[in-house]
Amino acid sequence: MNLSFFDQFSSPYLMGMPLILPSLLLPTLLFPTPGRRWISNRLSTLQLWVINLITKQLMTPLNKTGHKWALLLTSLILLLLSINLMGLLPYTFTPTTQLSMNMALAFPLWLATLLIGLRNQPSASLAHLLPEGTPTPLIPILIMIETTSLLIRPLALGVRLTANLTAGHLLIQLISTATIALLPTMPSISTLTALILLLLTILEVAVAMIQAYVFVLLLSLYLQENI
């Protein structure tokens, strides 16, 4: 019974082939495509408004050089947002609960920001490893600490997204299981549990959106340090 709670985090298979790739591609098919008319419909207008709002928030702390990343970061946040929200639907698989996928997104992008800084301004990038005004005896220790904190950034990005979504899905499944189990014997308690489940679902919708935003926002801040 305990192991069955984690079955939702296993990639489903069809004829021996994992279905994680279609689950990653499906959210991109849900976005409306722009029409050929001069005036867009309401759905396309809402989509463009959301994309412009997200892009503005991400690009505000960056200079003009960092604006080259606008398409990549906006596409990434829309992909994560779609996958996280679709994962809250019943009988669906959430790819972002897999640490391997989140690390595959976090590590290359973090490494790209680091290499850009080392190529364009190596002195300023290396200066981040030593805070200004550090006493001489503490310099080796602080360099080791700052280097460690720099290297664990992609791990923190991936683990944060995985842990938050996994915990939310487990809580929803545990409370929903308790609601069904209490319904025949204690209907009043089951009703209260169902209300808690509704509030938790609303909270998880907010968590899904916030975690997608935090993931990309931290990448933009890492980029800001290196351009």
UniProtKB/Swiss-Prot annotation:
Q: Where does this protein chiefly localize?
A: mitochondrion
One BP term from GO: proton motive force-driven mitochondrial ATP synthesis
Pfam families in alphabetical order: ATP-synt_A (PF00119)
Enzymatic reactions: H(+)(in) = H(+)(out)
Keyword Membrane present in the record's keywords: the answer is yes
NCBIfam families of this UniProt entry? ATP_synt_6_or_A
How is this protein organized at the quaternary level? Component of the ATP synthase complex composed at least of ATP5F1A/subunit alpha, ATP5F1B/subunit beta, ATP5MC1/subunit c (homooctomer), MT-ATP6/subunit a, MT-ATP8/subunit 8, ATP5ME/subunit e, ATP5MF/subunit f, ATP5MG/subunit g, ATP5MK/subunit k, ATP5MJ/subunit j, ATP5F1C/subunit gamma, ATP5F1D/subunit delta, ATP5F1E/subunit epsilon, ATP5PF/subunit F6, ATP5PB/subunit b, ATP5PD/subunit d, ATP5PO/subunit OSCP.
Entry similarity comment: Belongs to the ATPase A chain family.
Function comment: Subunit a, of the mitochondrial membrane ATP synthase complex (F(1)F(0) ATP synthase or Complex V) that produces ATP from ADP in the presence of a proton gradient across the membrane which is generated by electron transport complexes of the respiratory chain. ATP synthase complex consist of a soluble F(1) head domain - the catalytic core - and a membrane F(1) domain - the membrane proton channel. These two domains are linked by a central stalk rotating inside the F(1) region and a stationary peripheral stalk.
Protein name per UniProt? ATP synthase F(0) complex subunit a
Native species of this protein? Answer: Coturnix japonica
The gene behind this protein is MT-ATP6
